[in-house]
């Protein structure tokens, strides 16, 4: 379970991942824009750059940064890390568990971001959301979650970083809330 220490500094939580991974939809659950389980995926516009919101996270006001996942923005974050990665308390990396063709790109992006976060926010807690584990989704021989973890675990071990992971879906809003400590 995600845990918040008794911190004096404000909490900064970043949600990062490839485009179309579901980051903004997750944030809409956290901010109350989506309160009931939808019957189909909501239609969303891509996040342009960084969108900031404030949520109550473990009874503490928390700044949430939703970093748009389009390639242009990903390159911007990697090129200007001092602008984005200071004072991060929680680093949520969202993986679209159904997007086989983007797995390698997602691994590479995670590695780049992870190295910068370790440099600029070495105490940030790492949380993986394996998103879109929808009711009709059945893990097949591709085993994207296992393949993703197999690729990135050596990086995490080398940096002596522990992590937490959750399977989430917009079709079970509770799964998202649990990942952010809003329900148990």
Regions of interest found by a model, annotated:
Residues 59-78:
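Switch II (G3) loop of P-loop NTPases
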Residues 136-184:
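Canonical P-loop GTPase G-domain recognition
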Residues 36-64:
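Conserved substrate/cofactor phosphate-moiety recognition/catalytic segment
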Residues 1-42, 58:
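Conserved G1/Walker A P-loop phosphate-binding module
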Residues 89-93, 117-132, 157-167:
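Conserved beta-strand/loop subsegment of P-loop NTPase cores
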Residues 98, 132-135:
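Acidic beta-to-alpha connecting loop that harbors the catalytic carboxylate
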Residues 75-100, 116:
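Inter-motif core of Ras-like GTPase G domains
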Residues 100-120, 126:
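Amphipathic helical hotspot of TIR/SEFIR-family domains
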């Amino acid at each position: 379970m995600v845990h918040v220490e008794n911190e004096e500094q404000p909490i900064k939580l970043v949600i990062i991942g490839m485009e179309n991974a579901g980051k903004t939809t997750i944030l809409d659950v956290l901010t109350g824009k989506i309160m009931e389980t939808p019957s189909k995926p909501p239609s969303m516009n891509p996040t342009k750059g960084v969108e900031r919101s404030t949520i109550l996270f473990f009874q503490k006001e928390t700044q949430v940064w939703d970093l748009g996942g389009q390639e242009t923005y990903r390159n911007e974050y990697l090129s200007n890390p001092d602008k984005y990665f200071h004072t991060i308390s929680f680093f949520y990396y969202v993986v679209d568990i159904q997007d086989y063709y983007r797995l390698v790109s997602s691994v590479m992006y995670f590695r780049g971001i992870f190295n910068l976060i370790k440099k600029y926010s070495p105490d940030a807690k790492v949380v993986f959301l394996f998103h879109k584990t929808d009711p009709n989704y059945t893990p097949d021989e591709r085993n994207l979650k296992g393949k993703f973890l197999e690729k990135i675990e050596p990086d995490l071990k080398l940096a002596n970083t522990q992590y937490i992971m959750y399977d989430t879906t917009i079709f079970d809003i509770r799964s998202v809330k649990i990942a952010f400590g809003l329900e148990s």
